[in-house]
Amino acid sequence: VILRGGSEAINTNLSLSKLIQKSLITNSVDPHSVQIISDTSRDLVTELVTTDKYIDLIIPRGSKELLRFLKAHSKIPMIKHLDGNCHVFIDEFADLAKALKIAINSKTNRFGVCNAAETLIVSKGIACEFVPKVVNELSKKNVTVRGCDQTNKMVSNIETASEADWHEEYLGPILAIKIVSGIDEAIDHINHYGSHHTDAIVSESKKNQNIFTQAVDSSSVIINASTRFADGFEYGLGAEIGISTDKIHARGPVGLEGLTSLRWVVSGCLLYTSDAADDRCC
């Protein structure tokens, strides 16, 4: 394992690496099995990500700029932890008391995390009743609301959402609200603007729950629960290195199991394949 951090935390990283290596020695593991690179220059990263002869996998954690750089230069496969533009969809068949608690928790439990909700989507059938209530609760939490045109007609003193807002991972006390005609438009919005991270539906309709889970192309799809449950510990995976939005190998919260692969061992007693192409017996 090779660890390479940024210049802003190099002293902390060096101290942590000493603790890791001390722990490895205590447990009779080669201390060189975990190494840290003290050089924080970008040139070294460019060189490192082309050494596919020696490195099997890169797990980048950082800015969008870092991920774009690695995508352009790396010759090594990556498990990427990208944006968390997460949505909560309040279906027309939702229990609105549940919906209010789920929406508020998804947004305000912690702002600066990747599984916090950034857009609330509300079916027009219950919007007139639900939207004013949720905006009122959000205001108590000092959350700025940016709404679509229909939202602005229902409540006052909120900002108007722009096209950019639907793409945005705010990581702060801002929430966009979109009113849609129904579940189909909600799914289209999520698949178009979302980051395939975590998206939730609040609904008492089993039919709509199934439609949503089948059609929303995200690593975690949640029914009647907060988006904050998209987490390695909550899924029983233990500590995670990130939440992958890729579709190859590990997807969603990536723990130790997600970093492993299979190796097949065949044990026999004079087992051999037949020479005949149509004979599959050993």
Q: PLM features: residue spans?
A:
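Short, well-ordered beta-strand elements within core beta-sheets of diverse protein domains
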Residues: 120-122, 172-181, 196-201
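ALDH superfamily catalytic-core signature
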Residues: 66-172, 223
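Residue-level signal for inorganic ion chemistry
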Residues: 58, 123, 186
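Flexible, glycine/charged-enriched surface loops at secondary-structure junctions
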Residues: 28-34, 111-116, 144-150, 198-204, ...
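Rossmann-like NAD(P) dinucleotide-binding subdomain of oxidoreductase/dehydrogenase enzymes
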Residues: 1-93, 128
